[in-house]
């Protein structure tokens, strides 16, 4: 569910921002502002839809009524994720990968630390760790990453002025890249989401209880699949780092480079 939302408002904009900034570094501020406005608008709509339809999503899509609270909490992570994804794309386009790397480190640290703090504060004696605590951790991690990204990029906008005409022109160029990229990400995420929904359902048809089916699915998705897909992560990282160089060479007409 989260991957589909990220495909709609984050991944496509991050890649488009990286490409456009690499091609036109002189217009980088306008490109980023345009990306954030468009991405944040979609993210806000998704947040409203997810929160208001959390019960339907839990019952009809996830087939687990206990996920209602989780879906509502998770909806608040979409907007900050969209904002710092655009900023990450901005720095990738400038070939400054240190900032996105630091952002991810801060996000993971805040996520784990906030989970521990929330459990320590809200747990009643020896009560078990509730799944919603991990969702609160995701929200805290995304918010922390966004705050760090905004503080870091603030210096690049000290003497910047934007015009409606340049913003409109950039929006058309952004849309031309964002739409096909997002469709590609959506198809991939949708396929993955269908798989994630079908695995627990199939396990329940096999005879397992809903709790045990989710337990086994958590083991598969959290332990097994990351190990199997690790080589693909390396290829994805290489693609992210190569995109600005390819875009810059293409804009300069250096096709052989």
Tell me the role of every PLM-derived stretch.
Residues 138-141, 145, 149, 153, ...:
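Transmembrane helical elements of multi-pass membrane transporters/channels
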Residues 45-68:
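Short membrane-interface helical motifs at transmembrane helix boundaries
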Residues 81-103:
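Membrane-interface junctions at transmembrane-helix termini in multi-pass inner-membrane proteins
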Residues 64-86:
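Alpha-helical transmembrane segments of multi-pass membrane proteins
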Residues 10-25, 229-253:
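Helix-loop junctions and terminal segments of transmembrane helices
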Residues 64, 93-94, 128:
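Helix-loop interface residues and adjacent transmembrane-helix termini in multi-pass membrane transporters
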Residues 103-117, 125-155:
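Hydrophobic alpha-helical transmembrane segments
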Residues 27-41, 171, 175, 221, ...:
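Interfacial transmembrane-helix starts/ends
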């Amino acid at each position: 569910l989260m991957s589909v939302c990220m495909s709609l408002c984050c991944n496509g904009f991050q890649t488009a921002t990286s490409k456009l900034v690499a091609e036109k570094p002189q217009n980088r501020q306008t490109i980023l502002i345009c990306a954030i406005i468009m991405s944040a608008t979609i993210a806000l709509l998704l947040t409203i839809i997810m929160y208001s339809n959390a019960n339907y999503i839990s019952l009809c899509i996830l087939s687990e009524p206990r996920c209602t609270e989780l879906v509502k909490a998770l909806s608040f992570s979409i907007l900050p994720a969209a904002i710092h994804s655009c900023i990450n794309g901005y720095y990738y386009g400038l070939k400054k990968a240190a900032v996105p790397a630091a952002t991810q480190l801060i996000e993971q640290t805040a996520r784990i630390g906030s989970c521990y703090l929330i459990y320590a504060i809200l747990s009643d004696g020896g009560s078990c760790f509730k799944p919603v605590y991990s969702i609160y951790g995701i929200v805290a991690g995304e918010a922390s990453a966004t705050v760090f990204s905004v503080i870091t990029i603030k210096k690049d906008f000290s003497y910047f002025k934007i015009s409606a005409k340049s913003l409109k022109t950039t929006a058309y160029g952004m849309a031309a890249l964002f739409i096909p990229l997002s469709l590609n990400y959506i198809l991939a995420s949708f396929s993955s989401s269908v798989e994630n929904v079908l695995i627990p359902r199939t396990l329940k048809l096999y005879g397992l209880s809903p709790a045990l089916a989710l337990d086994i699915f958590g083991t598969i998705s959290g332990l097994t699949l990351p190990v199997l897909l690790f080589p693909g992560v390396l290829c994805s990282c290489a693609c992210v780092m190569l995109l600005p160089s390819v875009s810059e060479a293409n804009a300069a007409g250096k096709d052989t480079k």
